[in-house]
Amino acid sequence: MSEMNVTERDPATEQTAAGLSTTRGIATRLSFDPSERERLRSLASRVAELAARPIERKKAELWTEHNDLRSAVPVIFCDPENGWNEIVPASSLQCSDPLARVWEMHLLKEIFWAVEMLDDRVIESFFDVPYNYEDTGWGLHEKRIGGERGGSYTWEPPLKNYERDFPSLVYPKIIVDKSMTDRVLDLARGLFDGILEVRL
């Protein structure tokens, strides 16, 4: 069981269906202890085993037919979104390093999708690492009201007065931290070597 204080920001609970869009802001040691490595490699092995099933190839064919507008049957994609935090509660994660927790959550979601969800989402033998980046934003910032713990929220639109506010809008710049991206990528490759293909 993790010793992370539940009041701290836990990036493992902030994932979408595609995982996290960046590793920026995750306070990781970039080195996992032996129990974390064993846990992650074990989960990755299970994902690889599930990805090798013939049904995954069939699901990929269904999606190709669907995207080519030739599908004879509908394809189903289920994503519990914030429900993931109930399906896989943060308190059930065994890793303590924040990045290890993100990866553990991701692998557990893949396993749940394959074993319990039983939709047409393809389980693949890849482990994708996102770029470590920041963006400069649009120049105006929304104010959210509510939304604690992934709940619903309303927001105040940042563009309230066209004449006054529009000139503040700018195109965001994406700034990639190549060094940190490479370090996280190397960590994943060393961890999942021979189990899952690590991709950037």
How does the language model describe each region?
Residues 2-200:
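Catalytic cores of TIM-barrel enzymes
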